[in-house]
From Swiss-Prot:
Residues 735-774, 910-928 have a biased composition (Polar residues). The modification Phosphoserine is found at residues 4, 73, 77, 114, 119, 135, 137, 300, 344, 352, 373, 416, 563, 586, 692, 751, 919, 949. InterPro entries: eIF4E-T (IPR018862). Residues 52-66, 81-99, 651-660, 724-734 have a biased composition (Basic and acidic residues). Phosphorylation by MAPK8/JNK1 and or MAPK9/JNK2 in response to oxidative stress promotes P-body assembly. Phosphorylated during meiotic maturation. Residues 130-160 are annotated as: Interaction with CSDE1. This is Eukaryotic translation initiation factor 4E transporter. Residues 218-239 are annotated as: Interaction with DDX6. The modification N6-acetyllysine is found at residue 485. The gene is Eif4enif1.
Length: 983
């Protein structure tokens, strides 16, 4: 009561407002005031002026009152409330059916319960009256007026004339029901009338259709527009049919279309399945099916249509196979066949394949329209599922390949030669098994000219065809087995070598052939075909870029290569090239000798990397990565940087986080760095960046500052000792590496958990900046597997390109990476010595992270990262010359260092050799696995202290990464603080 009275009061107040506008102070109420008024006793008294006829449930109902004032506004009878109307709906249905004027058969009862045209909106029992606001809905009256005018079916949705609209606005429920009955009756007569035109074949369909007409309003009326202006005029076909009367086939076809329209109008095609079947089965020339022969015109046996590869309907056994699988005869037409036309007229179920290769191609090509433009007759009906009639939109594969400048001559020319053989094999049932095909595909030669396009097709074929089965044979004489044809022609033309050839992409060097990921390749190829910027499949793109931007991975190769010459072949051009002995041990402390451990996983890596790949610019890489062409998992596998010792991290994390991080980083990374210049200072400079403080624990920051102070204090003039340390260092480092093998075992527990790493490692020997940065980020990013982290190499700060680390050592699951105590690249050592640092002092100085003040940093900075072998302590920023200030290292140095690490020899903690002495000492207790967290924290310090550096980490990493807490560390791992204290 209160509410309605309040409304009333408010209504009165507003009426007063209307009267008062002339007066200068009309009443204005705030919401609070009105609510307050509502609670007052006067508000609870019923004004005498309120007529009780507008009550609903004893409360005056303004809606009823309004309805009586503006009858057309929608309330059909002011006396009945909405609730009463809706309650009366169901009984009204039943009564209507019993109406003597109802000519429809008794099973209308079923119809009432069956889905109706408006089933989307209102369930089975909805009647027009339910939309109470529109119970005077245009449609019902329209049905009368317009029917009289043109005898048009209700579904045609003509715009209603105002006369019809206003007419009978006060109809009672019974009147409305009668109206509906009349409409239905008229519909029924209409249908009978049409049925008399000799359309005997549609009798069954008419019955169904008639049932579906219980509700005259098409669903889009009841669920859709509420005003005339919103009504869309959909012209009907019945008028035309009546006019054309006895025009035979033409009329029949149009009516078929109109029936379909009616079906869709009424029912969304739910109740009409049988009718559709009947129509489609009995009307072979129905325009709805545009045979796909339009797309793939048959050609004389001498010609070969490239698109035939993708037409599954030409594969003879396919239809029968599918029928066997589905257990259906070839006659049964799908009830949805009008939307999914089957180019092979056989009516076989092969059209029920989820999607044809053409469709797949279009989807990949992005050519698929959201709603495909309808074909010839599809304009006749509104279908939720786009019709198949869009022949013109099909992708012409041949055209695509031509656009991509793919040379098809060898393919096509070899076809005629193979034709007979293929025919025989297809008749005899000899078909490549999926495994064979896959094997063939894996070995595809990725030719720069051919650009994988042909392989892509093979791959695509394999995917689509193998879904059905390994039997792939073409039906027509002129068309050979799609698969055999493709594969054989490829083999014949040399596109598909029997033995996988070493592809020019680094991919094949890095990945064993079996690992070449199929998915990314196919996607990328498509991209290439479509003229996208990607120049190689993303996977190989990334890889080749990652590896390629490092001019030669001499370190990796030299470390692993069975023979020294190889490393020599790939000697880097970096300033430090002279330091590369053919067998320089890898920085990570894996001796070249005990390589057996590494051997298997890295076989892929042993393949020489072609310099060509080195040309890949990082931008391209970034593009590829950003475009997400390769699946994250594949990318991660392929691009995991192996020189990253910290990388014993489970692949899962890397794939999850790495891809995202890498992409962010890539998108932000500065112009591509030139990987070749490992010694150029510029890249180093570009690396300068700092970790945001939020990223670094306060204790670490404090330590950083303390150590910085300490460095400054300790800087003392150094003695110049021209050192011939280079060779000694190298030898010793090699020895150390050999001896360091045992150490790795400490890490084995963690690494064994990572069997997947081997693939990762295998996949990339080195990665350019994008990777690097990704790792720096990932290091932070990977808190979950703290145990797995290896302190050794903090990847250089994101900005730096990896200047071809000469010695990256991929992690191997079972060979933990050890970070030997002293690790300074011999070249660096030599320079330091040349600058007057006595070799004896190096270990202690380095351990403390301090170099004597006399040392000139410039040359050191110029050193490529590979030379600065200090893993833990980055070089201090150029401004503060101390050489290896542990925390304050500039990212630049970080990067440099990193590279150096990669190249440099890591000496096992215990080694007493001079190299050990010379190289920076990492506290020996840092277990190899402490890696990431530690590294990472280091990285943070280094970078974070580098707050002076212009480039902030934020530039490279998303805030999510920067704000993550440091990874938790297993007990074996030394925290940075401990590390510093021990020093």
């Amino acid at each position: 009561m209160e509410k309605s009275v309040a409304e009333t009061e408010n209504g009165d107040a507003f009426l007063e407002l209307k009267k008062l506008p002339t007066s200068k102070s009309p009443h204005r109420y705030t919401k609070e005031e009105l609510l307050d008024i509502k609670e007052r006793p006067y508000s609870k008294q019923r004004p005498s002026c309120l007529s009780e006829k507008y009550d609903s449930d004893g409360v005056w109902d303004p809606e009823k009152w309004h309805a009586s004032l503006y009858p057309a506004s929608g309330r059909s009878s002011p006396v009945e409330s909405l609730k009463k109307e809706s309650e009366s709906d169901r009984p009204s249905l039943v009564r209507r059916i019993a109406d003597p004027r109802e000519r429809v058969k008794e099973d209308d009862l079923d119809v009432v319960l069956s889905p109706q045209r408006r089933s989307f909106g209102g369930g089975c029992h909805v009647t027009a009256a339910v939309s109470s606001r529109r119970s005077g809905s245009p449609l019902e009256k329209d049905s009368d007026g317009l029917r009289l005018l043109g005898g048009r079916r209700i579904g045609s949705g003509r715009i209603i004339s105002a006369r019809a609209f206003e007419k009978d606005h006060r109809l009672s429920d019974k009147d409305l029901r009668d109206l509906r009955d009349r409409d239905r009756e008229r519909d029924y007569k209409d249908k009978r009338f049409r049925r008399e035109f000799g359309d005997s074949k549609r009798v069954f369909g008419e019955r169904r259709r008639n049932d579906s007409y219980t509700e005259e309003e098409p669903e889009w009326f009841s669920a859709g527009p509420t005003s005339q202006s919103e009504t869309i005029e959909l012209t009907g076909f019945d008028d035309k049919i009546l006019e054309e009367d006895h025009k035979g086939r033409k009329r029949t076809r149009r009516r078929t279309a109109s029936v379909k329209e009616g079906i869709v109008e009424c029912n969304g095609g739910v109740a009409e399945e049988d009718e559709v079947e009947v129509i489609l089965a009995q009307e072979p020339s129905a325009d709805q099916e545009v045979p796909r022969d339009v797309i793939l015109p048959e050609q004389s046996p001498g010609e070969f249509d490239f698109n035939e590869f993708f037409n599954l309907d030409k594969v003879p056994c396919l239809a029968s196979m599918i029928e066997d699988v589905l257990g259906e005869g070839s006659v049964s037409a799908s009830r949805f066949s009008r939307w999914f036309s089957n180019p092979s007229r056989s009516g076989s179920r092969s059209s029920s394949l989820g999607s044809t290769p053409h469709e797949e191609l279009e989807r990949l090509a992005g050519l698929e329209q959201a709603v495909l433009s309808p074909g010839q007759n599809s304009g006749n009906y509104f279908a939720p599922i786009p019709s198949e009639d869009h022949a013109e939109n099909k992708v012409d594969i041949l055209e695509m390949l031509q656009k991509a400048k793919v040379d098809l001559k060898p393919l096509l020319s070899s076809l005629s030669a193979n034709k007979e053989k293929l025919k025989e094999s297809s008749h005899s049932g000899v078909v490549l098994s999926v495994e064979e095909v896959e094997a063939g595909l894996k070995g595809l030669k990725v030719d720069q000219q051919m650009k994988n396009s042909t392989p892509f097709m093979a791959e695509h074929l394999e995917e689509t065809l193998s879904a059905a089965s390994s039997n792939r044979q073409l039906k027509k004489d002129g068309d050979m087995t799609a698969f055999n044809k493709l594969v054989n022609t490829m083999k014949a033309s040399g596109t598909l070598p029997t033995q996988p050839k070493v592809s020019r992409n680094v991919e094949s060097h890095l990945l064993a052939p079996a690992e070449i990921p199929g998915q990314p390749v196919s996607k990328n190829i498509l991209q290439e075909l479509l003229g996208q910027p990607v120049q190689r499949p993303a996977s190989s793109n990334l890889l080749s870029g990652l590896m390629g931007s490092l001019e030669a991975t001499a370190s990796l190769l030299s470390q692993r290569a069975p023979s020294p010459p190889m490393s020599q072949v790939f000697r880097t051009q970096a300033a430090s090239a002279d330091y590369l002995h053919p067998r320089i041990p890898s920085p990570i402390g894996f001796p070249s000798g005990p390589q057996q451990l590494l051997g298997d996983p890295f076989q892929g890596m042993r393949k020489p990397m072609s310099p060509v790949s080195a040309q890949m610019s990082q931008l391209e890489l970034q593009q590829a990565a950003l475009e997400g062409l390769a699946l994250p998992h594949d990318l991660a596998v392929q691009t995991a940087p192996f020189y990253q010792p910290g990388f014993s991290k489970p692949q899962v994390d890397r794939t999850r986080d790495g891809l995202r991080n890498r992409q962010q980083r890539m998108s932000k990374s500065p112009a591509p760095m030139h990987g070749g210049n490992s010694s150029s200072p510029a890249p180093a400079a570009s690396i300068t960046s700092m970790l945001s403080p939020s990223f670094t624990p306060t204790s670490v920051i404090r330590k950083m500052y303390e150590s910085r102070e300490k460095t400054k204090e300790e800087m003392a003039p150094g003695m110049v000792v021209p050192g011939d340390g280079k060779e000694d260092t190298q030898k010793t480092s090699e020895e150390n590496l050999l001896s360091s093998n045992p150490i790795p075992n400490t890490d084995q527990d963690s690494s064994t958990t990572n069997p997947k790493l081997s693939t990762l490692q295998r996949s990339s020997c080195s990665t350019p900046l994008s990777q690097t940065s990704r790792y720096t980020k990932e290091q932070d990013y990977r808190p979950k597997t703290a145990g797995r982290k290896t302190p050794t190499l903090a990847s250089p700060v994101p900005g730096t390109p990896f200047l071809r680390p000469t010695h990256q050592v991929p992690l191997v699951p079972h060979v933990p990476i050890v970070r030997p105590a002293h690790q300074l690249h011999p070249g660096l050592v030599q320079r330091l010595i040349a600058q007057g640092v006595h070799p004896q002092h190096l270990p202690s100085l380095l351990q403390a992270g301090v170099l004597p003040p006399g040392i000139d940093m410039a040359p050191l900075q110029g050193l490529s990262g590979p030379l600065l072998g200090q893993p833990l302590y980055p070089l201090v920023s150029a401004a503060s010359h101390p050489l290896l200030n542990p925390r304050p290292g500039t990212p630049l140095h970080l990067a440099v260092m990193q590279q150096q690490l990669q190249r440099s020899v890591l000496h096992p903690p215990g080694s007493s050799s001079q190299a050990a002495a010379i190289s920076v000492q990492t506290p020996q207790n840092v277990p190899s696995r402490s890696g990431m967290p530690h590294m990472h924290s280091q990285l943070e310090h280094r970078t974070s202290q580098r707050s002076s550096s212009p480039v902030g980490l934020a530039k490279w990493f998303g805030s999510d990464v920067l704000q993550q807490p440091l990874p938790s560390m297993p007990t074996k791992v030394i925290s940075v603080d401990e590390l510093e204290y021990r020093q």
